[in-house]
Amino acid sequence: MRVRWLQFAVGALGLGFGAATEAIQIGLGVNAERVLIDFVVGETYLLGGLFAWGRQPRNRTWLLMVGVGLGWFVGNLAGSTDPVLHAIGIIFADLDAIFLNALILAYPFGSIEGRADRFVVATAAVGLTAANLLFYFTGNLAPNLVIGLFITAALAVLVPRRWWLAPPQLRRVLGPAVLAISVVLLAIGGLRTRHRPLGGGRGTGRP
């Protein structure tokens, strides 16, 4: 019962936080349809994580999904007129990408194994945040772009490699995910190269 109330509290917090940050975007004149799509994507991760929490609480994949869902909206704070919220929105704009990278490498058991996997997750967490901090003070996006492309390339190697080395039963589980992730990573890498750095800089790099 206590877990259910905690799930409800986290879900309510996530819904309220997401709605509040999307209101900031609407105030900036962002198209309502785009705001709605953005809201739905973030809440899908959040609610999916909460559902997984209820089904398999010992599998920490749910925690990473909730992290993606909540982190998805942090970059929206960059549009706030409050200087503190604005700074938070820029510096921590890549929280969703950081958690997503960890989620990709932790799937399906919820644990990150292997030095290379841990290195990529640590690089995403420290590197992207530091790059956003640099952008906040200098306006230079180049480090974020370089780190983002490195992470994209690393995942494009590590995820298929994990499938290749997995036993047959695990391959069946990883197969569809590997295909979907590979396509998404290639698309993201191409878009980042032309438009903005990986992780979105969701507050710093909204086109």
Regions found by a protein language model. Give the residues of each.
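Alpha-helical transmembrane segments of multi-pass integral membrane proteins
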Residues: 1-207
